[in-house]
UniProtKB/Swiss-Prot annotation:
It is a single-pass membrane protein. It comes from Eremothecium gossypii (strain ATCC 10895 / CBS 109.51 / FGSC 9923 / NRRL Y-1056) (Yeast). One of its GO terms (cellular component) is mitochondrial membrane. This is Altered inheritance of mitochondria protein 36, mitochondrial. The gene is AIM36. The chain crosses the membrane at residues 36-54. The lineage of its organism: Eukaryota, Fungi, Dikarya, Ascomycota, Saccharomycotina. Belongs to the AIM36 family.
Length: 221
């Protein structure tokens, strides 16, 4: 179908360009970081998909189809979204999963939050809008269901949980979160700015650690 849109003149021009100017391609180096804006875009779309998935699985109000107007309304709302906590309202220490607990130097009075702790808060609440989705994942995957959440889901739920248990001026230690750079970027664009990332020795080359190194926020233990 697409070949019909290519005119003979355009084909001749392409052949001439191919002969007169050979192209060279260079594979991106392993140290190259993905565009932050692209990651934010993926995070927004992922959040949208998660919200709609949770709605569609709600047994009391099933909905599997959405009009174009409904989709645009949700997407516009995501574009206008501001972070749950303003900059400097919440001190967030993010600790990677491989860091020994005894090596963590948390601020005085800081609240420790684990991923499973936040998810269980909503899974065990039968009146929560995400209860049905989380319950189904738990039934299939057991306690490891957090690894099978839709993209964007974990950050959305972590944000809701922190909004419930924290207030302006608090300090919080996120244990085992974020798990990757996409979650880190989504968290900072939707929930709060991460004050520092605590990483274990030997993780200096990971993209997540490199991302926070660019703003001097890495603590290696």
């Amino acid at each position: 179908m697409f070949r019909r849109l290519v005119t003979p003149r355009l084909l001749r021009l392409r052949r001439q360009q191919g002969l007169s100017r050979p192209y060279a391609s260079k594979a991106p180096g392993s140290e190259d970081l993905p565009s932050a804006w692209k990651m934010v875009g993926v995070a927004v779309v992922s959040t949208l998909i998660f919200v709609q998935a949770a709605k569609s699985i709600d047994r009391s109000k099933p909905q599997t189809e959405f009009s174009e107007a409904e989709f645009e309304k949700v997407r516009s709302g995501l574009r206008r979204r501001v972070t749950v906590f303003k900059p400097d309202e919440l001190e967030v220490l993010a600790v990677l999963a491989d860091v020994p607990v005894e090596k963590i130097r948390a601020p005085a009075g800081a609240r420790a939050v684990r991923v499973q702790q936040a998810l269980e808060r909503f899974r065990t609440d039968e009146h929560d809008k995400y209860h049905a989705l989380l319950e189904e994942l738990h039934a299939v995957h057991g306690d490891d269901y957090s690894a099978h959440l839709p993209k964007g889901a974990l950050v959305a739920l972590m944000g809701r949980y922190l909004k419930e248990v924290c207030q302006a001026g608090d300090s919080v230690v996120l244990l085992g979160f974020p798990r990757n750079m996409q979650e880190a970027i989504q968290f900072e664009s939707e929930v709060a700015v991460i004050s520092a990332l605590v990483a274990p020795q030997g993780s200096e080359e990971s993209q997540l650690v490199q991302y926070f190194k660019t703003v001097n926020k890495v603590i290696t233990v």
